């Protein structure tokens, strides 16, 4: 069972583009050893374990345009929830499965930027898997549970504030 989890994690690592690269939805995969972001492998391994333990639902694999559209819909929903909760932007988000960097920016009116080159230097950061984002938005996983499981990482000094904001936005 552990070998299977390790294989899944290594496969996910190979799909994580680096900063300034195209994402996995573009089907262009440079050297996988240049593609990692600090903490992304930990999130990938935790996600594989959570899926394996039925703590997070396994998602159907979607690639290309269909995968990008699904991720875009999730991120738009997250943006809407931030806005409804009155949470400010300044959040860079990495979906570790595809390597898709996105950004929520603004104060009263939030804007979602997809396919950004990486995190904005002053942004709070959020690393998570598609399965974790789906579960958070569906209400089957709280942000506290996601952090405990390791399927979400909020690195940096602003991580606690972002956790609080996610709690407000997701109602968990």
Model-derived segments and spans:
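Bacterial N-terminal signal peptides
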Residues: 7-18
């Amino acid at each position: 069972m552990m070998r299977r989890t390790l294989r899944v994690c290594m496969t996910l690592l190979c799909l994580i583009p680096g900063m300034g690269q195209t994402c996995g939805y573009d089907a262009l995969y440079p050297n996988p050893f240049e593609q990692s972001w600090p903490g992304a492998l930990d999130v990938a391994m935790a996600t594989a374990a959570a899926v394996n333990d039925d703590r997070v639902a396994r998602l159907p694999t979607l690639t290309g345009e269909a995968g990008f559209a699904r991720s875009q819909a999730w991120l738009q929903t997250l943006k809407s929830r931030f806005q409804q909760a009155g949470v400010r932007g300044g959040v860079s988000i990495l979906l570790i499965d595809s390597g898709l960097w996105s950004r929520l920016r603004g104060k009263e009116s939030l804007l979602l930027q997809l396919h950004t080159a990486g995190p904005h230097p002053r942004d709070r950061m959020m690393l998570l898997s598609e399965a974790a984002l789906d579960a958070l938005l569906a209400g089957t996983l709280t942000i506290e549970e996601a952090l405990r499981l390791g399927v979400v990482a909020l690195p940096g000094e602003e991580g606690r504030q972002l956790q609080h904001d996610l709690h407000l936005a997701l109602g968990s």
